[in-house]
Amino acid sequence: PTITIKFDNSATFETNLERIITQKWIALFPNGIESWSEHRRTGYPKLLPVVVNKGRNVSTEAGMRRLMYPNEEYTQNSFHLNNAINVLIKESSNNQGGDTGGTHVWWDRKANE
């Protein structure tokens, strides 16, 4: 659905929340990591779907959920990295888990629709 700028007291709570979060996302846009985190946290704004998805376990609808660990972690910190990956697998809300871009982190609970 198209979200207008004007706040509407007769609209549903979720519609008004979407309006507020969309404006917040626009305000955060110059700080890409913050706007991306806000989108992952809330599911708003509704973004255009990905046309070509070459991501490993990344949902076309939900998009990238987290950054993967850098290669240096695998070579220089493998013990702690494996412990962290096991936590990701155990606590993932989407049952994908592991060190992939599609793994939901602990605070990423609202699914993007």
Predicted regions and their residues:
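C-terminal functional modules
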Residues: 1-113
